[in-house]
């Protein structure tokens, strides 16, 4: 097992690692819409929150040497299912022709008032 910890400003207060490689798979912990360099919550709309959370997922992928087209599954958490449309638009732009399995889960609130949290699972090698 290998821990994947991309650099970011400040200290992570949660008891978890950004990513874990195990048995040929990368498991990316939930990435909030928080800027990793400033540690500030995204001030924008749902599209900007989604873009930032996906960029944070991408940051973990890249740190592990994994490409977006190796992602096999994402879970997207949001406080309201009404955001499904704009989340889907940004998600489609991010992944392009690649369509990993996905679920969008409507929750109550997310930590720090974020509008999106995304976790992912990726293969270390593509077929």
Residue spans of the language-model regions?
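N-terminal presequence-like segments and the immediate start of the first folded domain
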Residues: 1-55, 59-72, 78-127
């Amino acid at each position: 097992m290998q821990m994947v910890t991309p650099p970011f400003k400040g200290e992570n207060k949660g008891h978890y690692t950004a990513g874990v490689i195990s048995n040929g798979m990368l498991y990316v912990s939930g990435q909030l819409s928080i800027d990793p360099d400033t540690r500030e919550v995204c001030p924008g709309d749902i599209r900007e929150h989604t873009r930032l959370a996906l960029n944070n997922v991408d940051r973990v992928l890249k740190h592990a040497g994994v490409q977006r087209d190796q992602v096999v599954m994402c879970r997207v958490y949001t406080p309201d299912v009404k955001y499904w449309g704009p989340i889907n638009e940004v998600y489609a732009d991010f992944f392009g022709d690649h369509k990993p399995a996905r679920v969008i889960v409507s929750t109550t609130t997310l930590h720090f008032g974020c509008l999106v949290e995304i976790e992912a699972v990726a293969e270390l090698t593509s077929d």
